[in-house]
């Protein structure tokens, strides 16, 4: 699963996930992409599950790029523990996603196969997504 090798601080404030994606909102590597239409959090498990289902669909033909990285730690306190006594331990890592962010890119397959693979991947994700193609200038 994806997670940072090391961070400056172990735990992070919750923060707010506002605004639109102004970085990573264009296709830069492949021909086709999967773009987020809503904001949300994408866990490292969800990123990996979507990657695996896409890889299985396209077999060996395609190159897939993952354009998001889970760099935010989410903490949790154990069950039946009283309030206080500090922040809980890190349970999992998430990537915060804004609308317009390209999540995955693909190259080396035809559009029909890419669209089917991205539909399977979108079923694993917690927000609405859209299939996009690279515009040729």
UniProtKB/Swiss-Prot annotation:
Gene3D superfamilies assigned to the protein according to its UniProt record, in alphabetical order: Ribosomal protein L10e/L16
A GO MF term: tRNA binding
UniProt record, GO biological process: translation
UniProt key word Transmembrane helix: no
Pfam short name (any one): Ribosomal_L16
InterPro entries: Ribosomal_uL16, Ribosomal_uL16_bact-type, Ribosomal_uL16_CS, Ribosomal_uL16_dom, Ribosomal_uL16_sf
Entry keywords, A to Z: Ribonucleoprotein, Ribosomal protein, RNA-binding, rRNA-binding, tRNA-binding
SUPFAM superfamilies xrefs: Ribosomal protein L16p/L10e (SSF54686)
Function: Binds 23S rRNA and is also seen to make contacts with the A and possibly P site tRNAs.
Similarity remark: Belongs to the universal ribosomal protein uL16 family.
Summary of subunit composition and partner proteins: Part of the 50S ribosomal subunit.
Name the UniProt record assigns to this protein: Large ribosomal subunit protein uL16
Native source organism of the sequence: Hydrogenovibrio crunogenus (strain DSM 25203 / XCL-2)
């Amino acid at each position: 699963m994806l997670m940072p090798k090391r961070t400056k601080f172990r735990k992070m404030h919750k923060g707010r996930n506002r605004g639109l994606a102004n970085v990573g909102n264009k296709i830069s590597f492949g021909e086709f992409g999967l773009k987020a239409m809503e904001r949300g959090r994408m866990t490292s498990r969800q990123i990996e599950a979507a990657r695996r289902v896409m890889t299985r669909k396209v077999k060996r033909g395609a190159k897939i790029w993952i354009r998001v990285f889970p760099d935010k730690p989410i903490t949790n306190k154990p069950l039946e523990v009283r309030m206080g006594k500090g922040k809980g331990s890190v349970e999992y890592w998430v990537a915060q996603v804004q609308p317009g962010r390209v999540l995955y890119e693909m190259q080396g397959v035809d559009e029909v196969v890419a669209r089917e693979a991205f539909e399977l991947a979108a079923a694993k994700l917690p927000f609405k997504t859209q299939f996009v193609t690279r515009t040729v200038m």
